[in-house]
Regions:
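Catalytic machinery of carbohydrate-active enzymes
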Residues: 1-386
Length: 386
């Protein structure tokens, strides 16, 4: 039975002592799921014997599958179901899949359901789940708080990083939040695949700069020719190997970037590895240069230094979390605007290749061997800001 705001009751605060089972509702996207991993770890450390399940959509589910802190991952295939219901002959099969999913969702009576997502799609599933207490936050949108069992908690969304916002949930429950690492679990199968990839591309023992140039929002994109020029400078002036990462849908754009390069030494991995292999890959890279997108958060979670190019979004809310990262952005009155469409894109166009390359040199200076710093960095520095 779903609960609505008219049925909110004034109740005592949720206590750790009353929790034996938890459902986390965080459906997507990749970066948001990565940001929720610290909360998962903290809940498990404070409730070692509790059942903890996670409701997630298919696209980002690979990130959390096999996580030691989880008892079960419940996967919603919402996008596929919607596609099959529009102009498809698979309506009957799809309906059976949905019913099976709902049966799985409702198979457990949870002591606590936490809607971390805060949109209508998560609110509806929170309402459909069986839970004694259902909590969420005031920053939620689209009426999702109507499905909670009690008034939402107030949190200041704008001034806090997403990881810190989500950890406030654990604070509210009385958890000790001092210890977590937020890493994505990878196993030997993922590492062995990377071993084969590194042998194939002669990457073992090489210093590697990964570049992830794509993003879902058009306003987050940097111009392809700038990535081409940046990659050329990394190859020519720093003597590093360059790896491009992205999904199979990014393949045409990455091919365009590679065609725009003077050199042929870059490796295009678009569509060749999954999210777990990507996480393992970033542990072997010296740096990732990226737009504001999911792989940026994966790299940060795996302790790979990140140089992030920001335009329409706010790095203090969703930037790479932790030490050792660098955000490059233009200080404009219109940024952050959080718009997915823009006629001028001044915030991204204002970021020059030289500025990114200079940030890369400073990043590498901290960890580079002396001979590389002298042989590469000093020669490169003469042209760094062009």
């Amino acid at each position: 039975m779903m609960q609505f705001s008219g049925f909110w009751k004034k109740r005592s605060p949720v206590s750790l002592s009353e929790i034996r089972s938890i459902l986390i509702v965080k459906l997507s996207a990749i970066g948001d799921v990565v940001h929720t991993l610290p909360l998962l770890e903290v809940l498990r450390k404070n409730l070692p014997d509790a059942r903890i399940d996670w409701l997630i959509e298919e696209e980002a589910s690979e990130i959390i599958k096999g996580h030691a802190a989880l008892n079960r991952v419940i996967v919603s295939r919402r996008k596929l179901w919607q596609k099959n219901f529009v102009g498809s002959g698979r309506k009957s099969t799809t309906l059976k899949e949905i019913m099976s999913f709902l049966k799985e969702l409702r198979s457990e009576q949870y002591d606590l359901v936490i809607d971390i997502h805060g949109l209508f799609k998560s609110g509806l599933l929170t309402g459909l789940a069986r839970g004694r207490r259902k909590i969420g936050f005031t920053w939620a949108r689209e009426g999702s708080t109507l499905f909670l069992s009690e008034p939402p908690f107030f949190e200041d969304q704008y001034r806090q990083h997403a990881i810190e916002r989500y950890l406030k949930t654990a604070n509210i429950l009385g958890c000790d939040v001092a210890s977590w690492n937020g890493r994505i679990p990878v196993d030997d199968s993922h590492r062995k695949m990377l071993d084969r990839l590194f042998r194939k591309n002669d990457l073992n023992g090489k210093r590697i700069a990964a570049i992830n140039p794509m993003a879902k929002w058009d306003t987050k994109l940097w111009e392809p020719d700038r990535f081409s020029r940046l990659a050329d400078r990394i190859l020519e002036e720093l003597g590093m190997r360059v790896l491009f990462t992205g999904s199979r849908h990014d393949q045409p754009a990455l091919q365009e970037i590679c065609r725009g390069m003077r050199n042929e030494g870059a490796v295009n991995l678009a569509g060749q590895i999954g999210l777990k292999e990507l996480a393992a890959l970033y542990t072997r890279c010296d740096v990732l240069i990226t737009t504001d997108t999911g792989p940026m958060h994966i790299a940060a979670a795996m302790n790979c230094p990140v140089i992030a190019l920001f335009g329409p979004t706010a790095p203090w809310r969703t930037g790479p979390y932790g030490n050792g990262h660098k955000v490059i952005r233009e200080d404009l009155g219109c940024s952050p605007c959080f718009k997915k469409a823009c006629s001028h894109k001044t915030c991204m166009k204002g970021i020059t290749v030289g500025r990114v390359f200079y940030a890369l040199m400073k990043q590498l200076d901290h960890k580079a061997p002396e001979k590389i710093r002298i042989a590469g960095h000093r020669r490169a520095s003469l042209r760094a800001l062009r």
